[in-house]
């Protein structure tokens, strides 16, 4: 129906420590770095458009190891998208090293309906109210203020 250049794959390589141990939903991988880099090689050979990396986003979660970001960029020629606890500063740092192409701001977008404008103008962000996320009501979704 559509070409490979319109297909992307999302990974959630939830490294639990910077020594790259991984435990997720009862699964344990002996070498998550090698596993995901090999998968990226295969996807690169197929010519897909992008890989999206969903990083762990809980408050004390570790960052992806820089060696993983570096090796993913060396391995995969398409676009790389990162998401999970991104700030403007973190996105700029990762981008300055050439590791990624696009950066997602999920929760900040919920709390800041004008997020692109705030980023452009260097304005502060509204704080996310975690207790209202995914609650089924309008509180926390349509009541965050726009910047003035």
Regions found by a protein language model. Give the residues of each.
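Flavin-dependent oxidoreductase catalytic cores
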Residues: 1-148
């Amino acid at each position: 129906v559509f070409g490979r250049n319109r297909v992307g794959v999302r990974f959630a390589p939830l490294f639990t420590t910077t020594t790259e141990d991984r435990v997720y939903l009862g699964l344990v991988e002996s070498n998550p770095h090698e596993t995901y880099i090999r998968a990226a090689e295969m996807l690169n050979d197929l010519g897909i458009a992008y890989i999206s990396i969903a990083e762990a986003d809980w408050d004390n979660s570790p960052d992806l190891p820089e060696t993983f970001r570096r090796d993913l960029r060396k391995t995969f020629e398409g676009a790389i998208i990162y998401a999970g606890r991104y700030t403007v500063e973190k996105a700029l740092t990762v981008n300055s090293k050439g590791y990624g192409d696009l950066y997602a701001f999920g929760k900040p977008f919920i709390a800041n309906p004008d997020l692109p404008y705030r980023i452009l103008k260097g304005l502060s962000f509204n704080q996310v109210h975690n207790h209202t996320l995914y609650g089924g009501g309008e509180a926390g979704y349509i009541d965050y203020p726009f910047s003035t």
